[in-house]
Amino acid sequence: MFVALGAQIYRQYFGRRGMAMANNSSVANKVCLIVIDGWGVSEDPYGNAILNAQTPVMDKLCSGNWAQIEAHGLHVGLPEGLMGNSEVGHLNIGAGRVIYQDIVRINLAVKNNKFVTNESLVDACDRAKNGNGRLHLAGLVSDGGVHSHIDHMFALVKAIKELGVPELYLHFYGDGRDTSPNSGVGFLEQTLEFLEKTTGYGKLATVVGRYYAMDRDNRWERINVAYEAMIGGVGETSDEAGVVEVVRKRYAADETDEFLKPIILQGEKGRVQNDDTIIFFDYRADRMREISAAMGMDRYKDCNSKLAHPSNLQVYGMTQYKAEFPFKSLFPPASNKNVLAEWLAEQKVSQFHCAETEKYAHVTFFFNGGLEKQFEGEERCLVPSPKVATYDLQPEMSAAGVADKMIEQLEAGTHPFIMCNFAPPDMVGHTGVYEAAVKACEATDIAIGRIYEATQKHGYSLMVTADHGNAEKMKAPDGGKHTAHTCYRVPLTLSHPGFKFVDPADRHPALCDVAPTVLAIMGLPQPAEMTGVSIVQKI
């Protein structure tokens, strides 16, 4: 009841906003974009709910004017080979550019040796060189890849050495959650080898488990353990020759990487002191907020430490840990200016976005570039998802309801751009129930068919794509359920007879090319921020 009422309010209020646009007649062609969730292209019939379903509409659309486009890995800003997902898919579709995830941006900087020219890193090194000559690196040292990566730390050490900072101290946070509990000693050995032999630069200053250094639940008594180790040397003392053995003894006492109590090296020199510079190198923000705020802001007071807080510290983060933090970051948030929704508003072209509850955020927040903002002339419609325990029990979900709302808009002709998401192939695909996924695909095809007929009747060009694969692989090789996304390409279809698809010159087309293609069909200019390309040309 509440969701339905919310949808009604959205329609009433935002419908008026949509009607306020004045330049809708400027478009060459009106476009209806459908994003199917979890519809990949695979010719393998085994466990393929899409191929084995009765889908005459999509069969027709994918036998005429269509293309297969990439929706996974580096093509959408994810690590190479990683399957796509709904959030990233809609970000790329709506942004008209590849939206690189932080780990990928950093990996590319490492690969291309860009750290030495990174503006914030250069700034941190200049501060250290022009001050007391001391710089600290602190973060999680492992190859877990969830919060940080050891390769990023190694690249930072090399760059800082090249940038000429006299003294570098490393504060090693043990993992044991995203890696095996006793694997830290191996990362410690790699680190010592790297500092002592590979670069001959930098000193290991402290070792402490992430349980203490990376708390995120306001357990400041935990943060205080790492804080006092870093500023005051509170912990068990050791040196480079003995620290590995200290950790092994901790393992023997059932103290694993995550829970390592502080081990202190370098004496007073390795402590965070007045006027020092600190770089935290975790790229995931949530577990860096407390320790960085304790060092660089007045949150050290929450630690209730009796030690004097060092004065004039300057903190930098690998990424932006919180918008209101005063720290510079090596990789600040990328600008998503002039995504498709914003650009249409700039062009005075109104638009309509529709989805059922499960995917409503994807056609609003994610499609709009990760912004909550609703642009001028943008109308939104929420269709309630069915209230069932699992969606295999109602595999059609609310596809018919979404189609109803889209057809209403096509008949009204108010908005030159309308788009929607169909959730069933993905949401039912995740249940692993093959027969239900077949029904989900068939229900989606019926809904698309109804919309297709309405676009033909009311003068809209229909485009159909997907955000990632899923329902085309419902069975694992051993016959068990496959419930994850896939790396298969997805379709992009176009019903307009005046355009044909062409491949970009230097790469395979991807989700980032959808928005530029929409603009080309509508006869609108493409903003400079969109680095995707239109993959159609006029016939």
UniProtKB/Swiss-Prot annotation:
SUPFAM superfamilies: 2,3-Bisphosphoglycerate-independent phosphoglycerate mutase, substrate-binding domain, Alkaline phosphatase-like. Pfam families: iPGM_N, Metalloenzyme. Its cofactor is Mg(2+); Mn(2+). The active site is at residue 86. Optimum pH is 7.5-8.5. Expressed ubiquitously. High expression levels in the nerve ring region, intestine and body wall muscles. It catalyses: (2R)-2-phosphoglycerate = (2R)-3-phosphoglycerate. GO terms for molecular function: manganese ion binding; phosphoglycerate mutase activity. Substrate binds at residues 147, 177-178, 210, 216, 284-287, 359. It comes from the Eukaryota. Binds 2 manganese or magnesium ions per subunit. Cobalt and nickel are less efficient. Disruption phenotype: RNAi knockdown results in embryonic lethality. The few surviving larvae have sluggish movements, abnormal body morphology, developmental arrest and impaired survival. The keyword Transmembrane helix does not apply. HAMAP family: GpmI (MF_01038). This is 2,3-bisphosphoglycerate-independent phosphoglycerate mutase. It comes from Caenorhabditis elegans.
